[in-house]
């Protein structure tokens, strides 16, 4: 009937066998602790099993249960410690101590108080185990007498346990998502989740209390199976294993909890580090000939350990003798360097180099530091008590601790060098910045001098600018507009557009502004057969070509002095072509001797006579100038046109594109018999009542572009007049 209401688990059976009234079974206790640490059983279930076992009335069973509980506390992991430090277990112990019924056995009571004190001392500073300290102080206040305190480190309760499993939707190694075909698998060593491809290895984990092979991922498998390689100079001395170290150790870790190969490597590394620590005064030189010759003497297997000890002693003695010889040679080298300066002495000194700095680490010291780091790294996977059972690690730690002053001096020297280099770098950057500034100033000054040297360059520019600018200086005292348009006469000029400003001139009485046809002249007016293309094209490339007369033409009113004018300025050279022999306007500075000083209203009349007499009707002139009559000399018509246009440009004072008066040469009068290709251009003249300057502004559109809209009404169209030259023929 009792079996119906109570069931015994496998853990309860093992606990009963481990806590029987017979002698203590330490192996079974460790096996139970491994089960708890590997999480094969739940920690709460294990705690309740031990609590039930403590209720037994047999004092031997209670003492055995307390010992088993202490073993599980020290080796069961933090998850089991949390259950022991819970109120459920600790209050049960307090109730056993304070029971008023049957008195508790004295040995059981002392053992219980001792364990509570030890657990409270080891759990100091851990918030998850603070109830142990509270129970200990509560019992002290109630008057319980505890045994003398033992200094117990908190590492006594530290033991490696399998980590908590982590969940994820993808493999934490190859990032492959899990699906119905790709299942999740947890690594027992790290707790991460992987797929089947990344966790196909199995390995026992004795450091976690897992003795049977379990699933691990590829990374943990490589980390656990690969052993840190020893230095190359240690492999030659692998035969000199001191087995006396194993005999001297009273507490040997059990084979189920540590790998045999790890123990051998650890002892070998410790022995070699001790040998090197004894000979740390030397520069790292260890003779290898004696070591390589000694193993041949070990012949029999019976006295193998004794012979290895003798060989080890002989090797140490040989290394000490070599060290003394090396010291003597080093001292002799120092004396020889101080006394002699010849080449032979220098060669012998070079054979035994002196240490560069006293604070530099020797190769042996560097090797000891790396060895100690490797050993500490490997001890992390071992039970907590392993480091306490290996006194050689402590000796190696002390020998390395003696290097701290040397390392501090080296660090200080390095920091001073670093500060010096930073200072030098700052100075160098400042000097480079100053040098760059000097170079920039020198380049800027050279560029400004170069630009001033080429301010006025004669000749036409191959890249004309569409928008002209007024030059800064005017040669020969001419006004800005006259210098702009006549500083370098253009070979082919179009008739000016009639948007002349009506400002009066300062030295002449201008009664009527110059009127001219608006927009560029149609190509039909100058489309004479047999004309030659000028050598330099116009600045806009669209002006009609006009044949140039020969220099010996009798109709030239002014002398041909193309080189008599000064060179154009830098701005005018973009808008003026090569000088024309017939259009040197700068050579004209006033009325010619023998000519009548007429007002400027005659120039538009002559232009009308030259261009529009083919209509058969005279062009109407302004009523304010009835006294002007056309000249009798037909050859002087272009000159008067130029003269009129030049003073019109002077009256405006501003350059415009359409104000470049292009007077046709005298030869053009004999080829105007062709009919115009377009409608006759209207005459742009102001009405008598209009004031001067009523035009909106100069037309700056390029020659050849469509004529802009004008704000004045053109005169009535006249019939094409016949050229006077044709009448003369």
UniProtKB/Swiss-Prot annotation:
GO terms for cellular component = endosome membrane; ESCRT-0 complex
Q: Localized where?
A: Endosome membrane
Tell me one GO biological process term: protein transport to vacuole involved in ubiquitin-dependent protein catabolic process via the multivesicular body sorting pathway
Membrane topology term reads: Peripheral membrane protein
Q: Which InterPro entries match?
A: ENTH_VHS (IPR008942), HGS/VPS27 (IPR017073), UIM_dom (IPR003903), VHS_dom (IPR002014), Vps27_GAT-like (IPR049425), Znf_FYVE (IPR000306), Znf_FYVE-rel (IPR017455), Znf_FYVE_PHD (IPR011011)
- Ranges of Low complexity composition bias in the record: 333-352, 650-661, 687-698
Q: Which GO terms describe its molecular function?
A: phosphatidylinositol-3-phosphate binding; ubiquitin binding; zinc ion binding
Task: Show where the UIM domain sits.
Answer: 261-280, 307-326
Q: Where is the VHS domain?
A: 16-147
- Residue ranges under compositional bias (Polar residues)? 279-290, 520-534, 560-575, 626-649
Identify the stretch(es) annotated as Disordered: 276-310, 325-356, 496-729
Q: Reply yes or no: does the keyword Signal apply.
A: no
Q: Specify where it is mainly localized.
A: membrane
Q: Which UniProt keywords apply?
A: Endosome, Membrane, Metal-binding, Repeat, Zinc, Zinc-finger
Pfam families (UniProt xref): FYVE (PF01363), UIM (PF02809), VHS (PF00790), Vps27_GAT-like (PF21356)
Q: Where are the zinc fingers (FYVE-type)?
A: 165-225
What interactions and quaternary structure are annotated? Answer: Component of the ESCRT-0 complex composed of HSE1 and VPS27.
- Job description of the protein: Component of the ESCRT-0 complex which is the sorting receptor for ubiquitinated cargo proteins at the multivesicular body (MVB) and recruits ESCRT-I to the MVB outer membrane.
Q: What domain notes does the record hold?
A: The FYVE domain is involved in the binding to phosphatidylinositol 3-phosphate (PtdIns(3)P) which is required for the association to endosomal membranes.
Per the record, the similarity remark reads: Belongs to the VPS27 family.
Q: What is this protein called?
A: Vacuolar protein sorting-associated protein 27
Q: Which organism is it from?
A: Aspergillus fumigatus (strain ATCC MYA-4609 / CBS 101355 / FGSC A1100 / Af293)
């Amino acid at each position: 009937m009792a079996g119906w209401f109570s069931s015994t688990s496998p853990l309860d059976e093992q606990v009963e066998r481990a806590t029987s009234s017979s002698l203590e079974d330490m192996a079974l206790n460790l096996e139970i602790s491994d089960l708890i640490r590997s999480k094969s059983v739940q920690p709460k279930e294990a705690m309740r099993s031990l609590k039930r076992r403590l209720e037994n009335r047999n004092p031997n069973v209670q003492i055995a249960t307390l010992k088993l509980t202490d073993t599980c506390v020290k080796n069961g992991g933090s998850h089991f410690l949390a259950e022991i430090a819970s109120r459920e277990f600790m209050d049960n112990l307090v109730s056993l101590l304070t029971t008023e019924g049957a008195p508790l056995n004295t040995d059981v009571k002392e053992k219980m108080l001792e364990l509570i004190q030890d657990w409270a001392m080891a759990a100091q500073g851990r918030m998850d185990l603070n109830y142990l300290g509270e129970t200990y102080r509560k019992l002290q206040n109630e008057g319980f007498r505890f045994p003398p305190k033992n200094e117990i480190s908190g590492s006594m309760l530290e033991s490696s346990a399998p980590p908590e499993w982590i969940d994820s939707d993808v493999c934490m190694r190859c990032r492959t998502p899990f699906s119905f075909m790709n299942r999740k698998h947890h690594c027992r060593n790290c707790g991460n989740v992987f797929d089947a491809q990344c966790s196909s290895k199995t390995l026992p984990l004795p450091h976690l209390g897992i003795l049977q092979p379990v699933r691990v991922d590829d990374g943990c498998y490589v980390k656990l199976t690969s052993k840190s390689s020893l230095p190359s100079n240690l492999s030659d001395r692998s035969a000199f294993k001191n087995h006396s170290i194993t005999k001297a150790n009273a507490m040997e870790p059990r084979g189920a909890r540590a790998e045999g190969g790890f123990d051998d490597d650890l002892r070998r590394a410790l022995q070699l580090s001790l040998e090197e620590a004894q000979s740390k005064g030397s520069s790292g030189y260890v003779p290898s000939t004696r070591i390589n010759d000694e193993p041949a003497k070990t012949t029999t297997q019976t006295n193998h350990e004794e012979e290895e000890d003798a060989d080890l002693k002989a090797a140490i003695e040989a290394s000490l003798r070599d060290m003394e010889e090396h010291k003597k040679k080093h001292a002799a080298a120092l004396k020889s360097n101080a006394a002699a300066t010849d080449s032979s002495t220098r060669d012998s000194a070079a054979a035994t180099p002196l240490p560069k700095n006293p604070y530099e680490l020797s190769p042996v010291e560097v090797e000891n530091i790396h060895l100690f780091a490797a050993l500490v790294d490997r001890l992390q996977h071992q039970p907590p008590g392993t480091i306490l059972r290996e006194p050689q690690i402590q000796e190696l730690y002390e020998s390395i601790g003696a290097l701290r002053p040397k390392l501090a001096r080296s660090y200080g020297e390095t920091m001073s060098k670093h500060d010096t280099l930073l200072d030098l770098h700052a100075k160098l950057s400042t000097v480079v910045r100053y040098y760059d500034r000097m170079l920039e100033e020198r380049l800027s000054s050279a560029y400004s001098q170069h630009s001033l040297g080429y301010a006025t360059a004669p000749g036409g520019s191959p890249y004309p600018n569409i928008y002209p600018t007024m030059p800064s200086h005017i040669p020969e005292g001419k006004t800005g507009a006259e210098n702009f348009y006549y500083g370098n006469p253009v070979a082919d000029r179009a008739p000016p557009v009639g948007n002349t400003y009506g400002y009066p001139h300062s030295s002449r009485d201008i009664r009527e502004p110059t009127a001219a046809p608006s927009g560029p002249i149609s190509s039909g007016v100058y489309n004479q057969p047999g004309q030659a293309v000028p050598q330099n094209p116009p600045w806009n490339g669209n002006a009609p070509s006009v044949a140039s007369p020969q220099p010996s033409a009798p109709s030239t009113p002014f002398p041909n002095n193309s080189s008599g004018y000064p060179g154009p300025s830098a701005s005018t050279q973009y808008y003026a072509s090569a000088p024309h022999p017939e259009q040197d306007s700068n050579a004209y500075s006033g009325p010619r001797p023998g000519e009548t000083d007429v007002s400027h209203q005659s120039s538009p009349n002559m232009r009308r006579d030259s261009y529009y007499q083919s209509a058969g009707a005279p062009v109407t002139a302004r009523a304010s100038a009835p006294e002007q009559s056309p000249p009798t000399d037909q050859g002087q018509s272009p000159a008067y046109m130029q003269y009129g246009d030049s003073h019109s440009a002077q009256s405006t004072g501003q350059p415009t594109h359409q104000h470049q008066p292009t007077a046709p040469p005298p030869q053009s009068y004999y080829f105007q018999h062709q009919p115009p290709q377009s409608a006759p251009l209207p005459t742009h003249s102001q009405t008598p009542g209009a004031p001067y300057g009523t035009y909106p502004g100069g037309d700056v559109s390029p020659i050849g572009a469509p004529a802009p809209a004008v704000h004045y009404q053109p005169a009535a169209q006249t019939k094409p007049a016949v050229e006077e030259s044709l009448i003369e023929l």
